[in-house]
């Protein structure tokens, strides 16, 4: 696998690494975007500091990913998606909008929520979860991801049977 996962926002770049399929993420790092001239320098720093062999990347960005050019509203790291494969000599690369990434992550535990199972504490813990109103979850109810930021809110309606996770 040798996968770098990243969340690139306007202020911070968050990184983690997965050595093998189904292994835990490790080598967590939080870097200030303003400390680096570009995203390549930040990733190079992270990779060298942790002595990592990176073959694949999955990068969530606070920007649209529909075009080759990635442009941030409040971050000077503008770049082209196509340059990453060449620069880092990657096997696979995925860019996704950060809110879309959050929506897609819901599939990892949607079935557990709808069937009243306990959520894996590696995914979420008591600090991450806040009960707004107690009750019994409604099976197949829509889920919503919201948050601050300069982008638009994304929505996805996932059903447990629609995912293979």
Locate each region found by the language model.
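Short glycine-rich, Thr/Ser-proximal phosphate-binding strand/loop in the N-terminal lobe
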Residues: 2-42
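Short glycine-aspartate micro-motif
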Residues: 3-7, 56-58, 143-147
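Short beta-strand scaffold segments in enzyme catalytic cores
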Residues: 13-17, 152-158
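A short, N-terminal amphipathic alpha-helix
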Residues: 41-50
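Short beta-strand-loop/turn "lid" adjacent to the catalytic site in phosphate-handling enzymes
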Residues: 50-95, 100-115, 145
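A gly/proline- and charged-residue-enriched helix-loop-helix capping module
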Residues: 109-141
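Small-residue (GG/TT-enriched) beta-loop-alpha framework at ligand/catalytic clefts
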Residues: 138-147, 158-159
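Single conserved hydrophobic/aromatic residue that forms the stacking wall/gate
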Residues: 157-160, 164-165
């Amino acid at each position: 696998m040798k996968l770098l996962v990243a969340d690139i926002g306007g202020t911070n770049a968050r990184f983690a690494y997965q050595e093998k399929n189904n292994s835990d993420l490790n080598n967590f790092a939080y870097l200030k975007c303003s400390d680096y001239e570009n995203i390549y320098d930040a990733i190079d720093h992270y990779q060298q500091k942790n002595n990592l062999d990176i073959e694949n990347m999955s990068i969530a960005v606070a920007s649209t990913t529909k075009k080759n050019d990635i442009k941030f509203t409040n971050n000077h790291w503008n770049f082209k998606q196509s340059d990453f494969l060449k620069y880092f000599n990657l096997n696979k690369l995925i860019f996704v909008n950060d809110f879309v990434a959050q929506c897609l992550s819901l599939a990892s535990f949607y079935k557990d929520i709808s069937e009243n199972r306990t959520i894996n504490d590696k995914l979420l813990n008591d600090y991450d979860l806040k009960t707004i109103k107690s009750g019994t979850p409604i099976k197949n109810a829509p889920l919503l991801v919201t948050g601050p930021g300069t982008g638009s809110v994304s929505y996805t309606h996932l059903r447990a049977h629609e995912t293979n996770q």
